[in-house]
């Protein structure tokens, strides 16, 4: 037997058998076959040929009047498909002299959504070959129908196509055709349109994604549980005989991560969030806030960076340098000793009053004036000690040796002005 020559364009025997099968019978397809045509392929290779009465190579698309069935009954009417099903279906008019199609079905109706989508050819001309419309099935009667998850994509040919199929499926309402009986009018609008039916499953997909998120959260909590147990064990070891620390460790809660209060350095350190392995651990692990604080103090210690930050400084803080302006530099050859004050003049009445009050208090040697009047003028912030003693040294009072050393350590310079010096030049 002579084998067919593939170069001559003849089809293999399997394809020939498919071409010779009767319309409406189930197609004989090899395992693993999937029917996923594009919009252009559906219109050009299937709908146009069907409208022009050209035989199709495989009857994979069944001929069914979709509007005589409910969408959940259509999968068993299809020749092929698992998640989506394809049908050739006629369309009828809703009114005898109108162009609107009748969308009513057995227990509901199909409602169009959005606008028509043009289908363009993939060639260089980019010609419009068809139109795609999306519809949703509603149970009941309009306008109180209940929306379902059944979707239909309806493909029809364009009006301007030059093919014979376009003439047969034009959207322009043809003149009514009188039937055999008197007064009978045909309601046929289109001989054939191609429809794809499927059930939307977005809600199920969203539920599946939600379950996946929950699983990931549970995995993260399970991964963190061993580290939480280790922190609780360490807290129990550091607490020793402390009852609160023992309770916190026994119930598996990392109470040290709630709050830490250092009584020596007077600081609060927040290390993390309060964690517990179960919901009952929070109520049974500690009966009061004081027990939580005791467990935190026993379990946690301040870090090295905190100790370094809060360590006392060997240099005393000078309040006058923080709040008063810096003293101006004196020209060379001038001295700030008490014998040169005669060549200087205070610029304001307040400074003059301050000088007079201090001089009187120091010259008279009155302990009450010397101790109370000077802080009222020189030390308005209430800073005592070495800073005040330094001012006494500046104003000319005699000081003990330890007071003089403390005053020299402050390095404070009181601002004076020269009467014959222009500071702005």
Swiss-Prot record:
Main localization of the protein described in the UniProt heading: nucleus
GO biological process, one term: pollen development
Expression induction or repression: Up-regulated by drought, salt and cold treatments.
One of the record's GO cellular component terms: nucleus
DNA-binding residues (ranges): 129-206
GO MF annotations in UniProt: DNA binding
Compositionally biased intervals (Low complexity): 12-23
Database matches in InterPro entries: NAC-dom (IPR003441), NAC_dom_sf (IPR036093)
Ranges annotated as biased composition (Polar residues): 1-10
UniProt-listed Pfam families: NAM (PF02365)
Name under which the protein is recorded: NAC domain-containing protein 10
Protein species of origin: Oryza sativa subsp. japonica
